[in-house]
């Protein structure tokens, strides 16, 4: 194992280096952020005009 992968958890070190791990972190957090924004938007639209009886 490489010693320069200090940000990567030990079980993921064979797959990721630090740069890959940081990019993965950005992608995952962006996906979660999008999901939260989408859920809030759906809730607001449902409160405005319910689409289920």
UniProtKB/Swiss-Prot annotation:
Q: Extract one GO cellular component term from the record.
A: plasma membrane light-harvesting complex
List all topological domains (Periplasmic). Answer: 49-53
Select a single GO molecular function from the record's annotations and give it.
bacteriochlorophyll binding
* Membrane topology of this protein: Single-pass type II membrane protein
* Membrane-crossing segments per the record: 26-48
Task: Enumerate the UniProt keywords alphabetically.
Answer: Antenna complex, Bacteriochlorophyll, Cell membrane, Chlorophyll, Chromophore, Formylation, Light-harvesting polypeptide, Magnesium, Membrane, Metal-binding, Transmembrane, Transmembrane helix
The UniProt entry, under Gene3D superfamilies, shows: 1.20.5.250
> Can you cite a GO biological process for this protein?
photosynthesis, light reaction
Which Pfam family is an annotated match for this chain, by its short name? LHC
Which parts of the sequence lie on the Cytoplasmic side of the lipid bilayer?
A: 1-25
Localization annotation: Cell membrane
Q: Where does a bacteriochlorophyll bind?
A: 24, 42
Q: Which residues carry this modification: N-formylmethionine?
A: 1
The record describes the protein's role as: Antenna complexes are light-harvesting systems, which transfer the excitation energy to the reaction centers.
Which family does the UniProt entry place this protein in? Answer: Belongs to the antenna complex beta subunit family.
- Name recorded for this polypeptide: Light-harvesting protein B-808/866 beta chain
Q: What species was this sequence derived from?
A: Chloroflexus aurantiacus (strain ATCC 29366 / DSM 635 / J-10-fl)
What gene is it encoded by? puf2B
């Amino acid at each position: 194992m490489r010693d320069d992968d200090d940000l990567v958890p030990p079980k993921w070190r064979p797959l990721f280096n630090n740069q890959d791990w940081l990019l993965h972190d950005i992608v995952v957090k962006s996906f979660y952020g999008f999901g939260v924004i989408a859920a809030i938007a759906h809730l607001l639209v449902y409160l405005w005009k319910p689409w289920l009886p």
